């Protein structure tokens, strides 16, 4: 049963990121086909910003509700339904016939993803109460998130190459539609194994005894939890800001490089997919590094700074220099940027269950992850695109790369400064 638990959590984490990271890959061709919107035009910028930010707002609001429901209805039930929601939404998006329809389905996908992370982390943390085992399980199952990123890069590259051999959708063989359809995969095994998944024993016991307290958003801001809530929310935003404000703009930056801009569109898509895959390999390495170090380093502040200190120096440089002029060097740089940034996502999955009590765990995690990460953090994508309009540079891609460098410096420096206020968990065991 423990392997089944870890398998479901790993599947959920993998396709959580899979569904999110397909957007930067599918967006340019989807906007072109559904709305006749060309890359580099003001209309493209408007729809790109809408596709990034509107789902983030919806995911943040409904994800917060999902965290509350995780505390009220149980971890397993909310986890399963959140995975089914994002899987079927992504599959339906493959058949979108207009940009508003695609936007609506991206919103429901984002809601499922936002709820899944919170429910899965609380569920796993409570199923494995031994501190060292819990750290390893959370660390290594979350590493599958980066496997999801690798999968979507690989799948998109394959579909861009071999899509013509697949059945046509609306009379065409578009890689972006097939990529969205592949998001259905996690729903299939989950429907079969759902009855065999256990509920969190601690939550179930409290519920049966009638001693489970009612969760409350207001409680997050009482003196006992106020500092934890504010600092973790802002730091989660910084972690997501680095990913969405810089790294996830690569599909728009890479086609502007001298070695790429002269290639036919299918070959450009293959190069973009390759660069994304290198970045995800870096992220996977970072998640495994975090999983190993989480057991070895006692201080949570010290653990996080292992990734923040080099990141504040290196990540802005990657976007300021290689991203504007050298594809080969960019691949090396983006591997490091992915490692340092994505490792921080796993950190929060390990840290947050240790600072909130059982009745408030889902709500507290959800506030940091969804208000901080999904709403504030992902809005860095919008900040970057707006800043790009004021940047120097001969092409839109170069201006976007410089803006990404500036945003990366801002969020990394802010996160490092905030780490000095991050509360250390009082003990190894989860608070009751």
Feature roles, as predicted:
Residues 1-432:
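Transmembrane-helix signature of 12-pass secondary carriers
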């Amino acid at each position: 049963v423990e392997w089944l638990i870890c398998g479901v959590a790993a599947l959920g984490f993998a396709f959580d990121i899979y569904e999110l990271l397909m957007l930067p890959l599918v967006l340019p061709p989807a906007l072109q086909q559904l709305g006749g919107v060309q890359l580099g035009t003001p209309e493209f910028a408007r729809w790109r910003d809408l596709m990034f930010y509107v789902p983030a707002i919806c995911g943040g609001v409904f994800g917060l509700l999902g965290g509350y429901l995780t505390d009220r209805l149980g971890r397993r039930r909310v986890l399963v339904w959140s995975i089914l929601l994002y899987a079927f939404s992504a599959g339906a998006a493959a058949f979108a016939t207009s940009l508003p329809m695609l936007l609506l389905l991206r919103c429901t996908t984002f809601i499922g993803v936002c709820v899944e992370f919170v429910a899965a982390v609380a569920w796993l943390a409570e199923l494995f109460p031994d501190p060292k085992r819990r750290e390893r399980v959370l660390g290594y199952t979350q590493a599958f998130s980066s496997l999801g990123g690798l999968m979507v890069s690989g799948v998109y590259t394959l579909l861009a190459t071999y899509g013509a051999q697949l059945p046509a959708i609306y009379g065409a063989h578009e890689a972006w539609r097939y990529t969205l359809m592949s998001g259905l995969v996690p729903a299939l095994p989950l429907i079969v194994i759902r009855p065999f998944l256990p509920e969190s024993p601690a939550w179930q016991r409290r519920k049966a005894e009638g001693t489970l307290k009612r969760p409350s958003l207001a409680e997050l801001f009482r003196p006992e939890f106020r500092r934890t809530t504010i600092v973790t929310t802002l730091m989660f935003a910084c972690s997501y800001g680095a990913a969405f404000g810089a790294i996830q703009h690569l599909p728009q930056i890479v086609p502007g490089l001298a070695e790429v801009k002269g290639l036919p569109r299918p070959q450009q898509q293959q190069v973009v997919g390759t660069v994304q895959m290198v970045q995800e390999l870096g992220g996977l390495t970072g998640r495994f590094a975090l999983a190993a170090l989480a057991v070895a380093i006692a201080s949570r502040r010290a653990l996080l700074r292992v990734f923040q200190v080099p990141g504040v120096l290196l990540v802005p440089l990657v976007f300021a220099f290689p991203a504007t002029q050298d594809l080969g060097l960019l691949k090396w740089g983006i591997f490091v940027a992915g490692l340092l940034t994505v490792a921080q996502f796993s950190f929060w999955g390990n840290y947050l269950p240790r600072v909130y009590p059982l009745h408030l765990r889902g709500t507290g995690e959800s506030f940091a992850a969804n208000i901080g990460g999904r709403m504030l953090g992902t809005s860095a994508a919008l900040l970057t695109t707006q800043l790009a309009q004021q940047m120097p540079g001969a092409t839109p891609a170069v201006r976007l790369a410089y803006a990404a460098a500036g945003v990366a410096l801002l969020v990394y420096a802010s996160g490092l400064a905030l780490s000095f206020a991050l509360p250390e968990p009082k003990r190894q065991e989860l608070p009751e």
